[in-house]
Design a protein with these regions (language model features):
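Alpha-helical adaptor scaffolds
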Residues: 25, 56-126, 148-151
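Short helix-adjacent coil turns
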Residues: 31, 65, 103, 137-138
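Flexible helix-coil transition and linker loops at the boundaries of alpha-helical arrays
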Residues: 38-47, 79-86, 156-159
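Terminal, low-structured helical/coil segments at or just beyond the last alpha-helical repeat
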Residues: 8, 151-193
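N-terminal leader/linker segments that initiate helical-solenoid repeat arrays
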Residues: 3-56
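Charge-rich, solvent-exposed alpha-helical interaction surfaces
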Residues: 36-39, 53-56, 73, 111, ...
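Conserved positions within tetratricopeptide repeat
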Residues: 71, 109-110, 140-147, 175-180
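Short N-proximal segments of mature Sec-exported proteins
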Residues: 123-137
Length: 193
């Protein structure tokens, strides 16, 4: 337990910052399936938006259940960017979500934890960390991180009915899990600090 706990910093009091890098990396739009993969491979070969194409191809591979290939492509994309830069942060954020969706909750949390030092205090961190920590059965830490979301925006995060608006890209299953965290927070809200 203690080795895993070291991978996540303690929550700060507030997380108001917007993180413009917390968006999907997209090099090619309007295509799906094999046509999308073909265009992404061509973009990589031409060197146009090569890093973005590699990251999007990694996402496609992970979504298709090809975790090893997806991870290899994500690492290539990350290795081609400036550590801590906007594109690096965006790729890391996406990689974390793909790891999470693959059931690799600890790996996702570790990936996202790297972003805490690179980004400061973006508002996506508390609910995302709470979700991953809850999935890892680290309930007390999850509730503490959820508390940071509530301290930041108390009118938004104290009602699970807001989750579909606050987290439109999250799967309903993940919003339901976060509602469990909210329930635990309501039962015993942690004090600050």
């Amino acid at each position: 337990f203690s080795a895993h706990a070291q991978s996540v910093p303690k929550p700060k009091e507030f997380y108001f910052d917007e993180d413009r890098a917390a968006t999907p990396v997209v090099a090619v739009t309007g295509l799906a399936g094999d046509a999308l993969v073909d265009e992404l491979v061509k973009a990589r070969e031409r060197g146009r938006k090569m890093v973005e194409a590699t990251a999007q191809l990694a996402h496609v591979a992970m979504a298709d259940g090809r975790r090893d290939l997806g991870s290899q492509l994500y690492e290539q994309a990350l290795g081609s960017t400036q550590s801590g830069g906007h594109l690096w942060r965006s790729i890391s954020w996406n990689y974390g979500w793909d790891l999470y969706r693959a059931g690799e909750h600890q790996s996702a949390l570790t990936r996202w934890a790297q972003l805490v030092t690179a980004t400061g205090g973006p508002s996506w961190i508390p609910p995302t960390f709470a979700l991953a920590l809850w999935k890892l059965d680290r309930k007390a830490e999850a509730v503490a991180w959820y508390g940071a979301a509530v301290r930041t925006e108390p009118t938004l995060w104290t009602d699970a009915r807001n989750f579909s608006t606050l987290l439109p890209d999250w799967a309903q299953e993940d919003r339901d899990t976060l509602a469990e965290v909210l329930g635990a927070w309501q039962a015993n809200p942690p004090t600050w600090p």
